[in-house]
Amino acid sequence: PPPAHVVAKLAEVAAKPDAHGYSASKGIPGLRKAQAAYYQRRFGVELDPESEVIVTLGSKEGLANLAQAITAPGDVVLAPNPSYPIHSFGFIIAGAAIRSIPAAPGPDFFERLRLAMRY
């Protein structure tokens, strides 16, 4: 078992109401500043860490946030099928209609994609 002082500290922190939940939805400010500085050094791109940089808990959250940012209710979004659920559901939650593109092995996917974009 862990030492008693470790268990006591864990219980103390767990009892605090502000110790539960996720970080701020934009992410930790210092991390956002570091990301903006990296893009400046690496790519020569200036980003405002307060309005142009976010930190997500993973790619699914990032895709859902992207869908909310770029989709208006009624938009039609093309999504491969099969795919991970978030590829469609993030856009569905944002009010989009999903047009599935069958993603079978072989070179036909891009032709099916071109056809789907016509409608």
Predicted regions and their residues:
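A conditional alpha-helix N-cap/helix-loop micro-motif detector
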Residues: 56-60, 106-109
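N-terminal small-domain helix-loop-helix segment of the aminotransferase-like
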Residues: 1-58, 65
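Sequence-pattern detector for short linear motifs
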Residues: 35, 63, 115-117
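Short, hydrophobic alpha-helical packing/hinge segments within bilobed ligand-binding/sensory domains
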Residues: 62-63, 87
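PLP-dependent aminotransferase-like
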Residues: 8, 12, 49, 68-119
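Hydrophobic alpha-helical packing elements
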Residues: 31, 62, 109-112
